[in-house]
Amino acid sequence: MSNSSNKFAVIGLGNTLRRDDGIGIVILESLLNSCKRERVDYFNFGIASFDLIYKLREYDSVLLIDGLDAGLAAGELKIFELKDISYHLKGPALSTHEFDLKSLFELYKRFELKSKIYVAGIQVQDVSFGDSLSQPLKDSLEHSISETRLFIDKTLLSF
């Protein structure tokens, strides 16, 4: 973890060529354009990689934004701590790309990361090839952005 105190990151995950799977990147880009905050670093990690684990170590708190398949209503946003993943989500697939949230959770435990990691997960409907969001995600996009922005202000920046 970083020697500097109160260091925060917001990280978008997803594949923008797989329709709803790109929702994490869409929300991240909106946040960058509308509410960039001091003390918060923003990163586009796309479909993620092991580099993400090393990036997480640099921050006290991190918010990951990602599309997920958790049996919720399409477009529904759920924000939770990564350590609570098994309590909040059901179903075999928590993420819609190769480096999923379950894998990240296992690596988080294995590497004994000290960062507090939150996940803003948005239920996907369609992850077929294409570059536009499904209608339910388009309809809920502004709500997801405003709730994510509110979470950043009230939780990450309340220290």
Residues covered by each model-derived region:
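N-terminal catalytic or cofactor-binding beta/alpha core of small enzyme domains
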Residues: 1-114, 119-124, 131-143, 147-159
